[in-house]
From Swiss-Prot:
GO terms for molecular function: adenine deaminase activity. The gene is ade. This is Adenine deaminase. Keywords: Hydrolase, Manganese. Belongs to the metallo-dependent hydrolases superfamily. Adenine deaminase family. Gene3D superfamilies: Metal-dependent hydrolases (3.20.20.140), Urease, subunit C, domain 1 (2.30.40.10). GO terms for biological process: adenine catabolic process.
Amino acid sequence: MTQWAMTESLEDRRRLVRVARGLEEGDLLVRGARVAQPVTREILEADVLIADGRVAVLGGTGDGLQAARVVEARGAFLAPGFIDGHVHIESSLLTPAGFARAVLLRGTTGVVAEPHEVVNVLGPQGLEWMLEAGRRSGLRVWASAPSCAPASGFEAGGARVGTAEVRQMLGQPGVLGLAEMMNYPGVLGGDEEVWAVIQAGRATGRRLDGHAAGVRGRDLQAYAAAGLHSDHEATTPEEARERLRAGLWLMVREGSAARNLQALLPVLRERPRRAMLVSDDVSVDELLELGHLDRLLRACVAGGLDPLDALALVTCNPAEYWGLHDVGLIAPGHLADFVLLRDLQSFEVLETFVGGAEAQPGELTPPLSGGGVHLGQGWDAATFEVPPGWPVLGIHAEQITTSREPEGSGDARLIVADRYGRGEWSACWTAGSGLTGGTLGISVLHDAHHAAFLGGSDTDVRMAGRALEALGGGLVVVSDGEVRASLPLPFAGLMTGEAPQEAAAGLARVTAATRALGCTLPYPVTTLSFLGLTVIPSLKLTPRGLLDVEAWQLVPSR
């Protein structure tokens, strides 16, 4: 099975040179391809000779290249394998093996995972598991070391990541840098622990990923001056250009929870040098129905980008940003990660190759202990009253930001309960979901991953909580004292070991049951999962209370 890190001896390189010189035959010859080279913005009619998992020769057709096996491209386009430079695999509800099964056939050959979901639950053990599971997946899985777990000091997760834990994770093979620094108030305010984490990342000489939602003007300049290198939170062309001018790499996010590509296409048409496409958080049903990075490429070309410029956003650009010098190009010495495409408009994938072999998704996922749901003994008698004077949390479809609505305008309660046994919970009113009865309960609540419940009577909420405990974490819909649908997520309460199709079917049942209760959100589970993320404006709910993100304080009751 191809792993993200190929062991390579000096003799392997010497053989590669001998094959390149024509002194030995290669292992694989892809003949008659049209090679798309984003870095030079040209398409070459060429044959590609491969040895020991790497490109030996990019030659003209008819050069007499020899190999033990030949694949006839018959004029198909051959492009570098796609790289997602920022993705939370856990948000797909799949393990790395399941995620690989969903994306390899869509042309994705590598991802930079940001595993702060599982790290929030289990600490550095979660990152180690993600890398090991990635090595077994058939997909190249690199990682960045989570910098904020939990995302802020307004809540506590299953684990707390401090400077010592960050240093430990940065030392893991396959970790490319520091993950998104979400605590921008701590960066700007000089928080000692935040700056110690930044310094731990700086000491490695690697990338320091940014996360600066809503930060503009002098504050953005100050954030960049702290040494952060990127941001994926731009939602308007003005924000995107401001980040590029500040020297930040622009990660254009298009996932299931936040969709920014259409808004930022005008900037991408200007061909910015330091930009890439990322999915961030994408659900399993969307992966299967719409695709992964191939879907984003189609949208870019339909929006006026040259296909080669679009390809650069998912190949050479993310590889350059992360210092992945062996991928992202079709060139001698580079890993033979490539995709055969029918054309450069639909980006229909004919075949995906990783390390010079047809992509084979892995079957095995290592075990992962811990991370269930523990609501405490007081849960069975709990009542969920909203404190007087609290504003209503406005929910907006396909966005992870919320709004502040006037008291009395709410239509469904939101309850967030600590799932790690501390016995804490709080409730607020929401507006915008359309939910008229019953409860949707989940154990996937960014980023500390407490249990969240939208709508319903106290009885339904309590029942949904106990159902989540019995599942070991997951998704559940309860109405009139009955469980209407559920999906177990036994891996840290975040992921299922089922195949993507089975996971998508389970998610579809939960979504259908939620819509039967009046919910109008296109992706109710995904939207609910971001209503507790304490570093995204405007209001977010934690087990300890309602947070005003802009004011950076809990909302007092009247």
